[in-house]
């Protein structure tokens, strides 16, 4: 099924390359709708892995150990899907190397490319380093793919010196990846904020986008954990405490997200600048009111009602809230992109009009989600989704703490 969706998306992209960008609606006043929406959305959920995992590592949260790898894998595959949207809206993707050879430093797009490239390489490294001990374990126990695991394990023998070097490398990457991750979505927001388009030209977009990215990333991680828990029988590792703690973190981010959303719209309303008020009105009570209030319901009302109470902050409850958040955050990206572009700021510009996605955009959107799921499934088949050596290390630490506590009590 996933391969069929991906194949159809590839067929539609080939059709776009043959017929030109006109089949993607690029001759309409409002365009790049789904491509740009999906770009921002996937870059956002990529924060599920490296950023959340790095913060939990640095704070030495013991409950993080079983979930870090599942989170870090989301980052890598989400980044691949996000950057693919750059190819979709190029009429000549084979010439993409030209801007790399002749970059324009004043263009926010070049900084986008630079930040995302560094983030992708850093995320792959951050995913790979903790995999090495488990790859060595697979090398010794899996005859079918031993050649692959032998090559990837880099001669790991588990000596104290190797463990010390690995811990130092992981610690360095955990510190380095946090500012990189924050810079990525900040620079993504500047693609909008550096323009004079109504309700894009805003100084609040940087932190607003970062908060939204972490928010949607946590939701994506919770859904992935629930599916993996059921599909691969990982109940002993993905326990209710993990869903409870991540649910509380998601509730905190929901409140932060509402604060930034309110601050953005309040300043526009109070400023009473005609072009921006036209966009604001379209969101609150006009053409975009339905997706806007659906977004508010999905991103705040539903998580607040479910995650505020321990009785409903269960595995099922957190998954329902996470699904609502992902829907709401996709709608938020859609509203940001489309509502502002639908209202011209000058009489010399187009006469506006509502955006309507083309078939090729819908097909490529479905193909991206299918490809993301397929890559994640393949990764789960080839590599352990739970860091075996880290879980064992955590169990050993817990046992030593219990023995120390017992000895002190006897004294």
Model region roles, listed by residue range:
Residues 14-15, 86-98, 128, 132:
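Transmembrane alpha-helix boundary signature
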Residues 39-47, 111-125, 289-300, 357-375:
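Hydrophobic alpha-helical transmembrane segments
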Residues 299-303, 313-411:
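TerminUS-proximal long segments
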Residues 1-48, 373, 377, 390, ...:
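N-terminal signal-anchor module of multipass membrane proteins
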Residues 70-76, 235-258, 317-328, 394-396, ...:
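Interfacial and helix-entry/exit segments of alpha-helical transmembrane bundles
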Residues 32-94:
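Membrane helical hairpin/interfacial module
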Residues 1-13, 61-63, 101-295, 306-307, ...:
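Long, contiguous internal "core" modules enriched in hydrophobic/ aromatic residues
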Residues 95-103, 275-279, 340-354:
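Membrane-interfacial helical/loop segments at transmembrane boundaries in membrane proteins
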């Amino acid at each position: 099924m996933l391969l069929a969706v991906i194949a159809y998306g590839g067929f539609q992209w080939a059709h776009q390359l043959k017929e030109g960008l006109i089949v993607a609606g690029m001759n309409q006043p409002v365009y790049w709708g789904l491509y740009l929406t999906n770009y921002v959305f996937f870059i956002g959920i990529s924060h599920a892995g490296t950023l959340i995992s790095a913060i939990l590592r640095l704070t030495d949260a013991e409950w993080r150990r079983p979930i870090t790898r599942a989170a870090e894998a989301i980052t890598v595959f989400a980044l691949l899907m996000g950057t693919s949207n750059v190819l979709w809206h190029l009429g000549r993707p084979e010439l993409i190397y030209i801007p790399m050879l002749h970059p324009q430093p004043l263009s926010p797009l070049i900084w986008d490319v630079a930040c995302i490239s560094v983030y992708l390489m850093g995320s792959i490294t951050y995913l790979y380093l903790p995999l090495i001990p488990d790859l060595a374990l697979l090398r010794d126990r899996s005859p079918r793919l031993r050649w692959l695991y032998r090559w990837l394990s880099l001669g790991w023998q588990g000596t104290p010196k190797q463990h010390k070097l690995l811990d130092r490398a992981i610690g360095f990457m955990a510190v380095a990846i946090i500012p990189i991750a924050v810079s990525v979505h900040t620079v993504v927001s500047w693609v909008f904020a550096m323009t004079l388009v109504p309700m894009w030209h805003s100084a609040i977009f940087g932190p607003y986008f970062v908060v939204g990215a972490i928010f949607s990333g946590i939701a994506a991680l919770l859904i992935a954990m629930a599916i993996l828990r059921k599909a691969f029988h990982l109940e002993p590792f993905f326990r209710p405490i993990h869903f409870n703690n991540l649910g509380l973190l998601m509730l905190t981010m929901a409140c932060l997200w509402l604060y930034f959303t309110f601050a953005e719209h309040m300043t526009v309303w109070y400023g009473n600048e005609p072009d921006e008020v036209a966009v604001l009105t379209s969101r609150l009570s006009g053409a975009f009111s339905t997706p806007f209030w659906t977004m508010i319901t999905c991103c705040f009302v539903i998580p607040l009602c479910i995650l505020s109470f321990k009785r409903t902050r269960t595995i099922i409850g957190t998954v329902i809230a996470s699904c609502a958040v992902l829907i709401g955050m996709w709608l938020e990206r859609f509203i940001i992109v489309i509502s502002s572009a639908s209202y011209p700021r000058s009489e010399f510009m187009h006469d506006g009009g509502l955006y309507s996605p083309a078939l090729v955009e819908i097909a490529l959107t479905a193909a991206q989600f299918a490809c993301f799921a397929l890559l994640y499934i393949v990764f789960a088949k080839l590599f352990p989704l739970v860091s075996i050596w880290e879980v064992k290390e955590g169990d050993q630490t817990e046992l030593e703490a219990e023995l120390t506590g017992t000895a002190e009590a006897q004294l």
